[in-house]
């Protein structure tokens, strides 16, 4: 029997041992994917809410396989490896097949020299067989040290030398472990240095090979691989030799071989790499990331996956930063700044307590401009500055930025036309050039005039404040008049168009056309503007229409309308654009619907275990292992998830609509499972416009109580402060007290803490 055939047979025997396929077709008592896609309501989301204790990750986990594939030659999604804020970034393919491999299509940018990894005596590309390769894992669940295992057995006898009386011989098949991280030293950051370790964790004898594009023009001397121009491509430990234009290392069980790969070639060979270098640099890199995450608001919930996700999303965004520029992605067509998406990511960092960093990151956004979207950007930039001022309280920064933000303010004040009081027509959205009077643009601009008034008062800019107040009132009247004249009442609920005065047809199903999909993607700005008065009949028209006409899937924003989507399929989700819809759910106090989006994103909007998102992902699976998604990773997708987590724990509300929050809501949308007996919810030093807030919630259901320690903000006292204890189904709160003082508590577990100040100890007495 030929060696190749023997190896193939041995591989076939390993399928059951290593396969990790997602049995999405075997879900019981669930609508089919076709039924769910065809429904105008969120079938899976509604079913999740009906489960005991409400939505959960486990409910969504196996309905579909996760995002896994991209429209690149390397097919498996890429993982960016970078030092914090480094300008040079490496690309690891998530099946372990190589580093800095070329994408091929126009969507992907080439970075560094492609390095391909091969294993076994047949030099098979690592990770080629999906049933043999594990999904990548981060160290401790979140640290950016990737680990991937791959089964590829070696023959256990000399070819041809087979004894006549051969006996059956079962043996452990070779399993290789690949580990990689970006070195965070100054040198590593400058050169995109990736350190790699191959280990044989099972089996007897293993072989690893490293291949470059320049296999016939390379030299390998003193463990340094150079190209024909004498540039250093990589360094190795003493395990490696060169054969047939590739580096090779033989491994016995428990042995390792290490490499240092340069994305940007160094100027000289002053950097030293040897057998101990991988571990030495690994320890320093781990400490770098621990120190960075220690600066953030600290959250601990009784769901390790959530704890890993928020830490890793912060790490990812530090890796996507190029200096002070929050790019949308890296090493693809989205390696650039966008005002709306960049703002989402920066404001998420601000919400997690990176105040000084966020001020620096905001400057490139304030300087950004794109023709045809000037008024859209003006509203975004003003709202960004308002939030930065509210959280940091840094008036000096606001004054320093005044030439930038006042230019945007004057654009809104001066460009409204006399005829209808609205801003001039501009692009329907970034991807659709059709000029319209955009409700998205006008609503956002009006809200910025509303919310900037407290800031102008704080800066004592009285003449400008007077001008803004007058304009905001006139603008609000004109905008409501335009919207009410444009609403389509033939649908239930009535349809609110983005294109005012243009007779935009109702989109139903929303994703049946491209324009409908973009209507769905951008209408969050309208929701966030709260243009309709509280309690008015129109207040919930938009959110109700989204939910009843196919705008939501597993709590995530849907899109579609492409007859022949090459990477996407006809139906997909663009979760990151649902941030304002999610915040509106909190405003309307619908925690279970909010959790549908939270867990839908975690289970089906991100890669499994590595938490990497793209701009959008298909709903139809490619195969049982995964679905396509577009140009990952994505800083706004990361920002979306950590913003949801932050707000389900700590949320501010402007109930009186005066442009400034006056209500603080704590733990208003936590999972009921998080307060099962013995579990704890904790958030420490979360920045708000009132100051930092912390709480620790300990469930002692077995003793009939829940204990809560709260540290209320000290910078400014909210007019109203509420804390909610969301108990598992079947449990009720009997009373709440602080010491001997009774605290008013509602049936849903909401306690009124408005009269309290400083640190507070609460006891909720509970029963079944």
Which residues does each PLM region occupy?
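Bacterial N-terminal signal peptides that target proteins for export
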Residues: 1-7
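Terminal accessory carbohydrate-recognition/targeting modules of carbohydrate-active enzymes
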Residues: 7-10, 18-301, 657-768
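Non-catalytic carbohydrate-binding regions of carbohydrate-active enzymes
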Residues: 24-46, 463-505, 534-692, 696-702, ...
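Active-site-proximal structural scaffolding
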Residues: 26, 141, 191, 225, ...
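The feature captures the catalytic groove of carbohydrate-active enzymes
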Residues: 242-278, 372-376, 410-477, 509-515, ...
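Aromatic-rich carbohydrate-recognition surfaces in CAZymes
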Residues: 251-253, 257, 282-283, 336-422, ...
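Substrate-binding groove/exosite segments of carbohydrate-active enzymes
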Residues: 288-400, 427, 437, 502, ...
């Amino acid at each position: 029997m030929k060696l190749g055939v023997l190896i193939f047979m041995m591989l076939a025997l390993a399928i059951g041992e290593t396969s990790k396929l997602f049995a999405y077709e075997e879900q019981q008592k669930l609508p089919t994917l076709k039924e769910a896609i065809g429904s105008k309501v969120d079938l899976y989301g509604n079913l999740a809410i009906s489960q005991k204790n409400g939505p959960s990750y486990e409910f969504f986990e196996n309905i579909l396989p996760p995002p896994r594939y991209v429209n690149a030659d390397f097919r498996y999604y890429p993982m960016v490896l970078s030092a914090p804020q480094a300008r040079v970034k490496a690309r690891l393919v998530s099946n372990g097949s190589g580093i800095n491999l070329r994408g091929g299509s126009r969507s992907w940018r080439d970075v560094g020299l492609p390095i391909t990894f091969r294993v076994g005596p047949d030099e098979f590309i690592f990770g080629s067989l999906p049933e043999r390769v594990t999904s990548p894992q981060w160290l401790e669940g979140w640290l950016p040290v990737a680990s991937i295992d791959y089964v590829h057995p070696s023959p256990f006898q000399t070819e041809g030398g087979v004894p006549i009386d051969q006996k059956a011989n079962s043996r452990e098949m070779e399993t290789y472990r690949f580990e990689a991280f970006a070195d965070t030293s100054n040198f590593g950051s400058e050169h995109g240095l990736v350190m790699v370790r191959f280990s044989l964790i099972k089996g007897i004898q293993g072989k690893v090979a490293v291949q470059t594009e320049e296999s016939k023009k390379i030299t390998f001397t003193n463990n340094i691989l150079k190209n024909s121009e004498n540039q250093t491509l990589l360094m190795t430990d003493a395990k490696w030799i060169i054969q047939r234009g590739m580096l090779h290392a033989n491994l016995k069980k428990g042995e390792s071989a290490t490499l240092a790969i340069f994305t940007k070639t160094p100027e000289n060979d002053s950097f030293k790499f040897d057998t101990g270098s991988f571990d030495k640099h690994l320890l320093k890199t781990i400490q770098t990331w621990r120190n960075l995450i220690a600066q953030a608001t600290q959250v601990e919930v009784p769901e390790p996956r959530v704890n890993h996700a928020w830490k890793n999303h912060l790490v990812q965004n530090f890796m996507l930063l190029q200096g002070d520029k929050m790019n949308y992605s890296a090493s693809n067509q989205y390696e650039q700044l966008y005002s709306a998406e960049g703002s989402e990511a920066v404001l998420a960092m601000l919400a997690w307590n990176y105040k000084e960093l966020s001020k620096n990151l905001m400057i490139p956004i304030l300087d950004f401009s794109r023709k045809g979207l000037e008024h859209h950007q003006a509203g975004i930039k003003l709202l960004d500055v308002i939030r930065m001022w509210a959280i940091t309280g840094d008036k000096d920064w606001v004054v320093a930025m005044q030439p930038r933000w006042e230019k945007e303010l004057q654009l809104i004040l001066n460009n409204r036309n006399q005829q209808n009081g609205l801003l001039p027509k501009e692009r329907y959205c970034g991807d659709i050039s059709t000029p319209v009077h955009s409700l998205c643009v006008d609503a956002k601009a009006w809200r910025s005039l509303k919310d900037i008034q407290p800031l102008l008062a704080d800066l004592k800019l009285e003449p400008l404040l007077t001008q803004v107040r007058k304009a905001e009132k006139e603008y609000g009247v004109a905008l409501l008049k335009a919207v009410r004249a444009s609403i389509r009442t033939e649908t239930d609920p009535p349809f609110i168009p983005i294109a005012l005065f243009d007779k935009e047809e109702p989109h139903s199903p929303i994703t049946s056309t491209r324009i409908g999909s973009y209507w769905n993607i951008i209408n969050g700005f309208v929701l966030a503007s709260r243009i309709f008065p509280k309690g008015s009949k129109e207040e919930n028209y938009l959110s109700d229409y989204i939910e009843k006409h196919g705008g939501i899937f597993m709590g995530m924003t849907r899109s579609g309308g492409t007859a022949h989507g090459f990477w996407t399929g006809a139906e997909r989700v663009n979760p990151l654009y649902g941030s304002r819809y999610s915040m509106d759910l909190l405003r309307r106090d619908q925690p279970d619907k909010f959790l549908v989006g939270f867990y839908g994103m975690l289970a089906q909007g991100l890669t499994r275990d590595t938490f990497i998102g793209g701009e959008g992902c298909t709903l139809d699976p490619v195969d049982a292992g995964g679905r396509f998604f577009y140009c990952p990773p994505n800083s706004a997708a990361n920002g979306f998830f950590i913003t949801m987590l932050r707000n389900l724990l700590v949320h501010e509300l402007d109930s009186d609509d005066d442009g400034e929050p006056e209500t603080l809501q704590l733990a208003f949308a936590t999972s009921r499972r998080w307060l099962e007996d013995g579990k704890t919810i904790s958030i420490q030093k979360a920045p708000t416009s009132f100051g930092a807030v912390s709480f620790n919630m300990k469930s002692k259901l077995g003793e009939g109580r829940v204990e809560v320690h709260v540290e209320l903000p000290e910078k400014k006292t909210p007019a109203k402060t509420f804390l909610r204890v969301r108990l598992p189904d079947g449990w009720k709160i009997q009373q709440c007290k602080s010491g001997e003082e009774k605290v008013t508590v509602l049936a849903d577990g909401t306690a009124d803490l408005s009269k309290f100040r400083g640190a507070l100890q609460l006891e909720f007495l509970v029963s079944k």
